[in-house]
Every structure is written in C-alpha cells, then in structure tokens.
Amino acid sequence: MKPPILIIIMSTVISGTMIVLTSSHWMLTWIGFEMNMLAVIPILMKKFNPRAMEASTKYFLMQATASMLLMMGITINLLHTGQWTILNNLNPTASTLMTIALAMKLGLAPFHFWVPEVTQGISLSSGMILLTWQKIAPLSVLYQISPNINPKLLLLMAILSVLIGGWGGLNQTQLRKILAYSSIAHMGWMSTILIYNPTMMLLNLIIYIMMTLSTFMLFMHNSTTTTLALSQTWNKMPLITSLILMLMLSLGGLPPLSGFIPKWMIIQELTKNEMIIMPTFLAITALLNLYFYMRLTYATALTMFPSTNNMKMKWQFENTKKTMFLPPLIVMSTMLIPLTPIISILE
C-alpha cells in the first residue's frame, strides 16, 4: 500500500474513533463506527491474498450486522424517548439491542467466533490494530450507557467470554490466535467490572492495550507467527525472546507483572460488592489463560520442540524496523505494579 493512501486510511480510522469518543449524539456515534469500519477493511487486506480477503469479508459482515442492530436500538430509543442524547435514560429493549451490537463489535462471547479467524487471516500489524485500537470505540459507548445496561445480560456474556477465552487458547499453535483468545478473555474481565466500577474498566483497557501492543511489536520485530518459530528464536534474538516471554506472562496475569493489576483490582472490587462466586470463577478461569502462556514460556525458554539440526540455527539479518516506542511500552507492560496504590483515587 502506497504511503499517501495509507495515511488517508489511517486518518479516517482515527477520525472515526475520535467521533465516537467525543460525540453525545447517537447518529454521530453511528457515523463514527461506520467510518471506522469502512476504513479499517483496506488495512486488513494490506497483504492481498485469499486468507486476508476472507478475513476482511468476515469482519465486514459481522460489523455490518452489529451496526444494523445498533441503529435499530437507536431508532427504538428515539421512538420511546424522543431524544438522540447518549447519556439519557434508555428504553430497556433499545439498551439490550445496543449491548448486543457493541458485544458483537468487541467480540464478546457468544459473538466471538469471528475474532480468532479474522486475526489469523491478516498480518501482524493489522492484527495489532484490530485487537487494540478497534476496542476503544465500542468500550467507550458501553462506558457511557453502563447505568442503563441489563447487568444479567452483560455478566452472562462476560462469564462466557472469560471461559471461552481461556478454553479456546489451550490447543492453539498460532500466536495470533492465542492473542485473539486472550483478547476475548480480557474483554470478559472488562465487561464484568463495567457494571460496578466503569473507571476501573478504563484502567484495565489501558493496561491491556499496552501489553498487546508490546507483544505484537516484538512479534513483528522477530517475524514470528507460530509457537514453533518462537521456540527457535532463542539463538537469533535471545533478549527479544526473553522480553516476549515476560510480556506473555504479564498478559496471563502472573504477579508481580503489570497484567496482575487489573485482575487483582477487579476481584477486590467484586468482593467489596459482596460477590463471592463471580470473583472465584474469574480467578479459576484466569488459570486457563496463564496455563497456555506458561506452556509457551516453558517450550521457548526451558526446552525445544522436536526439530532437525538445520532448523535450529536461523540467519540473523540486521533489523531496520523502528522501535522508538517499544522500550517504554515494555517497561509499562511489565513493571507497573509498584504504582498500584495510586489507583486508590479511583475508588
């Protein structure tokens, strides 16, 4: 893709998200979602091959269906209240339709099936945008309508997302699919706390975006897409391999890394609200995510997958990719836990 075209497309993607973030009018929000969706499809098809075309088509169909449901919810709400304002009280039917539409855009279970397939079919850079930037707009709308959301519906989708996000990643060998299932699980955690403390959901989102960005950037730096390729990079880029492993353990929520902060704070907040079963379930299902990350770490750092001798040594080429933002991102993705007391201002 030529640089001028890429700049125009990226500007449209950013503009669409910014319109959603700054608007208090339902029609403007919907237009922002449409701008964002139509601009991101060429980014997904950057590598023009059948897999990317299939992934882009799946993404378009899912997002178009979600947009249709969102517009239906907006119309029903307009008929009942006569208001276009987002922060107004919503009609229960409209609220349910909007929640389902936003869940489809986010990839919450049971509307999650497109996320692993689309992520696997596109390049690492496109996958990074899909699993980070594309989560901001739907979550911002959910944040704004959180007082009017049906809590039982959202908790049901959150429970399913955390369970499927952990269970689905267990038998995966493709790193993009592992990160996609991890994204589904993280969306489940965010949806759980949204009802009780929406500000904590934003904290979770920021930490999730930092960890996922760092991981994808290191995979791009390393040109790694499978667990087998990752297990053979120890002799090519030992420092980067060890950083990837730390980031993956942080994504799994292992203390004392940054990924433990949101899980700790969410479980603490749920316990304060006299919920015992939900945080227990979340803690147990978090072990599923941690297990497949630990397995990946073990395979890379402590042992080697079966392979021939000529596969074990890789050529080392000089890497020309710019990594200016990578060091601070890695530091924040792994070492934020001493700053946890500052989060008390959210309460």
From Swiss-Prot:
InterPro entries per record: Complex_I_Subunit_2, NADH_DH_su2_C, NADH_UbQ_OxRdtase_chain2, ND/Mrp_TM
Transmembrane segments: 3-23, 25-45, 59-79, 96-116, 122-142, 153-173, 178-198, 200-220, 237-257, 274-294, 325-345
Chain segments annotated as coiled-coil in the UniProt record: none
Pfam families noted in UniProt: NADH_dehy_S2_C, Proton_antipo_M
Catalytic activity: a ubiquinone + NADH + 5 H(+)(in) = a ubiquinol + NAD(+) + 4 H(+)(out)
Disulfide bond annotation, renumbered to this chain: none
Membrane topology according to the record: Multi-pass membrane protein
GO annotation (BP), single: mitochondrial electron transport, NADH to ubiquinone
Principal place of residence: mitochondrion
Record carries keyword Transmembrane helix: yes
GO cellular component, one term: mitochondrial inner membrane
Compartment list: Mitochondrion inner membrane
GO molecular function, one term: NADH dehydrogenase (ubiquinone) activity
Enzyme class label: translocase
Domain of life: Eukaryota
Keywords: Electron transport, Membrane, Mitochondrion, Mitochondrion inner membrane, NAD, Respiratory chain, Translocase, Transmembrane, Transmembrane helix, Transport, Ubiquinone
Known EC number: 7.1.1.2
Keyword presence, Transport: yes
Subunit details: Core subunit of respiratory chain NADH dehydrogenase (Complex I) which is composed of 45 different subunits. Interacts with TMEM242.
Family per similarity comment: Belongs to the complex I subunit 2 family.
Function: Core subunit of the mitochondrial membrane respiratory chain NADH dehydrogenase (Complex I) which catalyzes electron transfer from NADH through the respiratory chain, using ubiquinone as an electron acceptor. Essential for the catalytic activity and assembly of complex I.
Designated name of the protein: NADH-ubiquinone oxidoreductase chain 2
Native organism: Paradoxurus hermaphroditus
